[in-house]
């Protein structure tokens, strides 16, 4: 889709888009503050006939099944779907990893090699 579709989605309360398709108007969409993770960009407009085939239904994206209630986290480098029943577990592990990487970053800034920083518990 393009900027108009993103604007419409945002105005309807959609917090972002994750698609295995392409998009156009990437700069305009970024200016909207509407995050999109997609397969790529394509400058040609989309077909005029857009049909909703489901809302709050399971979908497959990139070989991963996403079920309503799953937590989707994405940035410019990728996206991850966390099953609803594992959100707490995964977020605790992410906090542990972030704390470890923050410690490693400090050690590297102090001159330690990455190899040695990885060995520190």
What is each residue range found by the language model?
Residues 78-80:
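Channel- or pocket-lining gating/hinge segments that regulate access to a cavity or pore
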Residues 72:
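C-terminal binding/interaction regions
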Residues 1-68, 82-115, 119-121:
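Feature captures the catalytic cores and cofactor-binding loops of soluble hydro-lyases/lyases
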